């Protein structure tokens, strides 16, 4: 027995399937052809260009913020290196003073071996006291490159005004990026005010990024120079401490022999 009624037509299912197929997908941005289609396409293109310009301006703004944050961290690290240099220099001065005092003690020990002659030698060869540098305020002197980089970063606003390419380009008309349009800015940027503002903001951000990255590079080079100089101080200090340790051992041996 057939599972379908006698009046059933199997080809009717194919017709129903074709009717049930989804309509082709169409983007809402697709514009129909017609008398106003070219103008609509131009308007859509303008909106797309403006959207991309705004996204680019926002991206350069975020990059600028990251650059400023990196520069701030670089300045903090550089200033910490300067304080560390001050500590190393004070330590070196103290080691020098200890070595001088130890030499004086050794002379006293040698003079004790001869009672009378020792007294004469003591008063005659007493070394002149040198002013103690660590008692005063010792101002650390960082490397010239690092000092210049720190000062440059702290004066970044004045430096930016002096080195901004757009300001030099537009100084004859006294215009600034994002300000009133001049003859130069009208030629350099689009006529659409919103698009022109985006382009000016992008140019301003890129120019400031260029100057800021230059400052950041100077900070990095200054930090490297400062680290190299502090390595020299550490090597010098290590040698002095080793020499002082030998002198202390020798002095202790002489004291026990008295």
UniProtKB/Swiss-Prot annotation:
Keyword annotations from UniProtKB, A to Z: Autophagy, Cell membrane, Cell projection, Cilium, Cilium biogenesis/degradation, Coiled coil, Cytoplasm, Cytoplasmic vesicle, Golgi apparatus, Membrane, Phosphoprotein, Protein transport, Transport
GO CC annotation terms, alphabetical: autophagosome; autophagosome membrane; centrosome; ciliary pocket membrane; cytoplasmic vesicle; cytosol; Golgi membrane; plasma membrane
Topology of this chain in the membrane: Peripheral membrane protein
Molecular function GO terms recorded: SNAP receptor activity; syntaxin binding
Residues annotated with Phosphothreonine modification: 130, 137
Biased composition (Polar residues): 131-142
Chief localisation class: cytoplasm
Highest rank taxon of the organism: Eukaryota
Subunit structure: Forms a SNARE complex, composed of VAMP8, SNAP29 and STX17, involved in fusion of autophagosome with lysosome. Interacts with multiple syntaxins including STX6. Interacts with EIPR1. Interacts with STX17; this interaction is increased in the absence of TMEM39A.
Function: SNAREs, soluble N-ethylmaleimide-sensitive factor-attachment protein receptors, are essential proteins for fusion of cellular membranes. SNAREs localized on opposing membranes assemble to form a trans-SNARE complex, an extended, parallel four alpha-helical bundle that drives membrane fusion. SNAP29 is a SNARE involved in autophagy through the direct control of autophagosome membrane fusion with the lysososome membrane. Also plays a role in ciliogenesis by regulating membrane fusions.
Protein name: Synaptosomal-associated protein 29
UniProt organism field: Bos taurus
Encoding gene (name): SNAP29
């Amino acid at each position: 027995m057939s599972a379908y009624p006698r009046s059933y037509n199997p080809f009717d299912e194919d017709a129903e399937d074709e009717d049930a197929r989804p309509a082709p997908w169409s983007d809402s941005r697709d514009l129909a052809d017609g008398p106003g289609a070219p103008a609509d396409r131009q308007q859509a293109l303008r909106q797309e260009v403006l959207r991309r310009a705004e996204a680019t301006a926002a991206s350069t703004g975020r990059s600028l913020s990251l650059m400023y944050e990196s520069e701030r961290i670089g300045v903090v690290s550089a200033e910490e290196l300067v304080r560390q240099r001050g500590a190393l220099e004070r330590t070196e001065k103290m080691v020098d003073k200890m070595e001088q005092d130890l030499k004086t003690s050794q002379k006293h020990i040698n003079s004790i071996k001869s009672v009378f002659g020792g007294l004469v030698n003591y008063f005659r060869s007493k070394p002149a006291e040198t002013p103690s540098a660590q008692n005063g305020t010792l101002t650390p002197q960082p490397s010239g490159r690092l000092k210049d980089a720190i000062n440059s970063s702290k004066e970044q606003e004045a430096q930016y005004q002096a080195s901004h390419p757009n300001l030099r380009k537009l100084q004859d008309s006294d215009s600034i990026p994002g300000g009133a349009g001049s003859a130069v800015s009208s030629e350099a940027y689009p006529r659409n005010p919103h698009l022109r503002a985006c382009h000016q903001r992008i140019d301003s951000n890129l120019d400031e990024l260029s100057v800021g990255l230059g400052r950041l590079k100077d900070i990095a080079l200054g930090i490297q120079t400062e680290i190299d100089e502090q390595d020299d101080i550490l090597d010098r200090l290590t040698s002095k401490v080793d020499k002082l340790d030998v002198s202390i051992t020798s002095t202790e041996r002489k004291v026990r022999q008295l």
